[in-house]
Swiss-Prot record:
Lipid bilayer topology: Single-pass membrane protein
Major subcellular site: membrane
Keywords linked to the UniProt accession: Membrane, Plasmid, Transmembrane, Transmembrane helix
Keyword Transmembrane assigned: yes
Protein name from the UniProt record: Uncharacterized protein y4uG
UniProt-annotated location(s): Membrane
Transmembrane segments: 12-32
GO CC terms of this entry: membrane
Length: 71
């Protein structure tokens, strides 16, 4: 059964979208994991009090701004 022109076009666009975006999904997952790791890293494990958390937050913010500046 021959496929219509619109069906072929739609199929082509879907395949382009899937194969074009599929490689970015792992990169997005890694980026989200990296950001979430910096946001909450160590607070629960170290039993940090509020001063330690404030210092850790400032250190993480400085580290992030340094990474952004390098880009």
């Amino acid at each position: 059964m021959p496929r219509g022109s619109a069906e072929r076009s739609l199929s082509f666009l879907v395949s382009i979208a899937f194969f074009g975006l599929a490689p970015t999904i792992p990169l997005l997952a890694i980026a989200l994991w990296h950001v979430s790791w910096f946001d909450g890293h160590g607070d629960e494990q170290m039993g940090a009090d509020s001063d330690d958390r404030a210092h850790a937050f400032q250190s993480d913010a400085a580290h992030r701004s340094d990474l952004i500046a390098r880009m």
